[in-house]
Amino acid sequence: MAKKVDGYIKLQVAAGAANPSPPVGPALGQKGVNIMEFCKAFNARTDKFEKGMPIPVVITVYSDRSFTFETKTPPASFLLLKAAGLKSGSGRPNTEKVGTIKRSAVQEIAETKAADMTGADIEAMTRSIEGTARSMGLVVED
């Protein structure tokens, strides 16, 4: 018989850096999940990513306090900033541009994010990532 789902927890945790301190500890503690077990499993699964890269994770908690988790791809904004070589986006993206990014780099990011994005095709996903870039103050050039 299938386990009864008690709830879902959505977090963004740095790759290889999950520890019991906030935000991980309190979020898992409320549901009664073994925090150290999650931290060890998460760090083992994310060791292929660059240290410190934010990784979205969805944790499914069952009524017997066991859990499973699914990692997603890093946020598009993080990948765009990394590709452009910037620390942060613009506070006023319509008037203040902070950098440029090539369309080919945007397409690579769209292909990376394709597993997590809902879109008809790669072109639609690329346009979505371009919109994210513009809203961060990046100029997309050919």
Curated annotation (Swiss-Prot):
Part of the ribosomal stalk of the 50S ribosomal subunit. Interacts with L10 and the large rRNA to form the base of the stalk. L10 forms an elongated spine to which L12 dimers bind in a sequential fashion forming a multimeric L10(L12)X complex. InterPro entries: Ribosomal_uL11, Ribosomal_uL11_bac-typ, Ribosomal_uL11_C, Ribosomal_uL11_C_sf, Ribosomal_uL11_CS, Ribosomal_uL11_N, Ribosomal_uL11_N_sf. It comes from Shewanella halifaxensis (strain HAW-EB4). The keyword rRNA-binding applies. SUPFAM superfamilies: Ribosomal L11/L12e N-terminal domain (SSF54747), Ribosomal protein L11, C-terminal domain (SSF46906). One of its GO terms (biological process) is translation. Forms part of the ribosomal stalk which helps the ribosome interact with GTP-bound translation factors. It holds the Pfam family Ribosomal_L11_N. GO terms for molecular function: large ribosomal subunit rRNA binding; structural constituent of ribosome. Keywords: Methylation, Ribonucleoprotein, Ribosomal protein, RNA-binding, rRNA-binding. PROSITE patterns: RIBOSOMAL_L11. Belongs to the universal ribosomal protein uL11 family. This is Large ribosomal subunit protein uL11.
